[in-house]
Amino acid sequence: MKDEGKAMQDMMWPRQDANIMDYGKESLYKFNLKCSGNVSENFSKFGDVFFKAAHVITEYILERQRIGELDCYFFPVAYLYRHSLELKLKAIAFKYIEDSGEIFIKETFHNLIKILEYIEPFIRDEINTDEDAYLWMKALFEDMNPIDKDSDAFRYPFKIEIRKDEVWGDKQYTIKKFFEGQKHINLIAFANKMEIVFDILCSYYENKKKRYEEYKKYNTFF
């Protein structure tokens, strides 16, 4: 929306055919990103675009089959897939949360298992249609959780931890590695697992009662 007399411009996001370059270039502030009032729909839309980005990049690197790209792109792909799952889980939660959701966010944060357990009572009918698929997904989350419960392992290959010196009380900064050594990952299996989980969560979000077969081809180990 263009309005040269307005300091801050509102740009609804995400939206159809959005152009982030479409703003008043003379305004004091370029634009203010806003979402619609429906929190659940916003989380769902963001989840969809994160998933699409992960899928497109995965197809690209698998088609090219270049070892250097497979190594370099794994972390971004894993982050995009993982975050799409978190967003879809939160979309489900906010379909049923009637208050501001502050308690939900505080209690679950980025933890996939905690979010899944929080929403389970709301989607019990959908889960009962294929509880084995739900338990498979939950086991996969439990295996991922020690590595990435705070949604930062795939954004950065390490995290900064702050500790206080026991004697002087000074702050000490240390680096914690998420992966201590070389790890071999089947990217095709990993991507397929993420896409199966996303499909299951989409059916929960849409209150569809579906049965699944594809997950049976894969174990629940990260």
Language-model regions, residue ranges each:
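Domain-scale activation on soluble regions of proteins
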Residues: 1-222
